[in-house]
Structures are given as C-alpha cells and as structure tokens.
Amino acid sequence: MAHEILIAETEAFLKNVAPETRTAIISAITGGKSACKSAAKLIKNEHLPLMSGEATTMHIVMRCLYPEIKPWKKASDMLNKATSSLKKSEGRDIRKQMKAAGDFLGVESMMKMRAFRDDQIMEMVEEVYDHPDDYTPDIRIGTITAWLRCKNKKSERYRSNVSESGRTALKIHEVRKASTAMNEIAGITGLGEEALSLQRQTESLAILCNHTFGSNIMRPHLEKAIKGVEGRVGEMGRMAMKWLVVIIYFSITSQPASACNLKTCLKLFNNTDAVTVHCFNENQGYMLTLASLGLGIITMLYLLVKIIIELVNGFVLGRWERWCGDIKTTIMPEIDSMEKDIALSRERLDLGEDAPDETDNSPIPFSNDGIFEI
C-alpha cells in the first residue's frame, strides 16, 4: 500500500514537469534497482529537465528506495541546511520515534500527532537518506511518502492550510509593516530616503508574489529576495538604535541652562542674544558621565556575551562550518542553477496546459518481496 501511495504522491509532486520526464521517472522508480540507479545518475548529472528542488527531491526518493544508490552532495547539503537549527536532543527523540513507528501509517501519524515543524520532518528525511541501512524499508518508504504528501498539500491552495506561496505573502506583509514602521521612525532618525526605497522594494515583491501565487517555480528566488529586504530592515533597525543613543544624550543636554552659565557663554563667545548657546552645568556633567559609563558597561557586557555565544556555537555545536558554507553561497551563488531554473520555468509556461499527458496510468506490478518490477 505504501508503494502505491508513494507513486501517487510522486506523480502529484511532478505535476508541473513535462509528461515524458514524469513518465521516465515513474518508470525508473517502479522498474527496480538498476533502472532507479540509472535515473539517479541522470538526475545527478543534470541530464533530465528538472528544477534544482525537483532533482534533489527525486534523488532522495530513489536513494531511500534503494540504499545502494550513492548519496548526492547537493541533496545532502540541502538537508543539512534545512535541519541546521534543530537541537541534538530533538534529533535523538525523532530517531527513537521513527524506529518505533513501524510503517507509513505510523510515520504519518507521528508527524500529525506531534505537529512536526518543517525542520523536524526534514530531520526524518535526512536520517533515512544519510543512514538508510539503519531503518527498515517500510520506515524509509513511509518517511519519504509522508514527506511528499506534506509538500504536495502545501503547494495546493487549501483554505484550511496556508500554502508556501501564502507563507511567502505573509512574510512580505511583515516586511511591509516593518518598512512602514521604519518610515514613521524616519522623522526622528533621518532615514527617510532609505525607508522610501525599502517600501518600493516591498511593493515590487508583493506584486511579484501575487503573480506567482500557487506556483513552486519562483518561490526559492522570492525567498532570497525577501531575505535581502529583511536584512535591510534589520540594518535600519540597528541604525535606529544608534540614533536612540544620540536621543538619550540629547535629552540630557537639552535641559535649560542657568542664567549664570548663559551669561558666561555669551561673554566667552562674544555672541548676541540671537544665537542660542548651550553650556553644561555641574549636574548635567554628572548625568552625562553616568550615561556614558552605563552605556559603556552595557556594550561591554553585550560583547562579552556575544563572544561566549559565538565560541559555544563554533566549538560545541559546530556551526562555523555551516556559516562558512552560507558565506560561500552568498559570495558565489549558484548563478548557473538559477538561470537554468528560470529558463526551464519559461519553457514550461510557453508549453502551457495544452501539452498531452503521456503519463503511464497502467497498474503497477510488484514482485513477491514487494519490490517494484516492470
């Protein structure tokens, strides 16, 4: 039963793929070990017209069916990145539950009962992909089938469940709210031009999101654009905090000076009454000194805590390697992969819905041991 559900969910996942490509992949999955290994090699060498996400997903499915297929670095990196925020204790607990689940129904119930987050589900997928021999075929097939079902449900426009495109729209809405708040702060902090630029960017993203709603094609590129805008919002927030420090000093120094000090200042600078001159009195000097000491102590404590956290993340949790990978990805992005995805998406849009569906809908044969055969 799990095999048949896997085929159905795989076909649903590949619904935007060209019919001949979808048929070739399904035939390979149902054609036994050798056919699956050949298809996995074609996917790894990018000889099939698949998006980056589609290719890695299909390779994961094939390796979980047949552990003899060697892991693909691109798929492993994707899984590592998806589970990087997961705690080790959560990972251990998930592995125990997986081994006790037994089959597809148990795995699916486990995901639903525990209301697993995306990173927890990806931890399960990573386990059966990295260590397939540690789990029974039922658990491996059940895990990837339940994972595909989750992906397919999120890609559809359900009213009860927010789709991935809907989540993207919500993120853009949050960014727009943040940019509006920054625009209001701009009156005090002098960030008006930056706030207006940010608002224009978020409006453009909102329009783009509306055009691509319900589509899996451009979502990764939208996510990257949103992260860029979120980074701008964060930077503007930090600038606003710096202006807050200036405002604290200004609130201290803006107290009325005594008549004696004002006269002294006017005599010293030989100014007329038309020029406003501020001289610090003794109380204001004490307040400025205390404010400077307080801000200095807070800054030093913050830096000390930050250094300790970074050391723990680096030496104990081993996150430095992942950060280096993220920096490398930012500095040297996969331009070729992005261009390939965009070109393929245009080709699919040009093809339209009039293309004949050549999917082989004949009954799927099985051997006595439950393995697919032609």
Swiss-Prot record:
PTM section of the record: Palmitoylated.
InterPro entries: CM1, CM2
Swiss-Prot/TrEMBL keywords: Disulfide bond, Glycoprotein, Host cell membrane, Host endoplasmic reticulum, Host membrane, Ion channel, Ion transport, Lipoprotein, Membrane, Palmitate, Phosphoprotein, Signal-anchor, Transmembrane, Transmembrane helix, Transport, Viral ion channel, Viral matrix protein, Virion
One of the protein's GO biological processes: monoatomic ion transmembrane transport
GO molecular function: channel activity; structural constituent of virion
GO cellular-component term (any): viral capsid
Parts forming coiled coils: none
Family designation: Belongs to the influenza C protein M1 family.
Descriptive protein name: Polyprotein p42
Gene name linked to the record: M
